[in-house]
């Protein structure tokens, strides 16, 4: 399973599926979740 293609900080904190991928936060360059 790949991390969500697009994320922002609100999505990372509020969306449980995204937040499990965003353990290292959102990559501001690629707009992807870092694991």
UniProtKB/Swiss-Prot annotation:
Q: Which cysteines are joined by disulfide bonds?
A: 7-22, 12-26, 18-33
Report the residues modified as 4-hydroxyproline: 3-4
Q: Which residues carry this modification: 4-carboxyglutamate?
A: 14, 17
What the record says about family reads: Belongs to the Pg turripeptide superfamily.
What's the protein name? Turripeptide gsp9a
Q: In which tissues is it expressed?
A: Expressed by the venom duct.
> Could you tell me which InterPro entries the record lists for this protein?
Toxin_Pg (IPR026210)
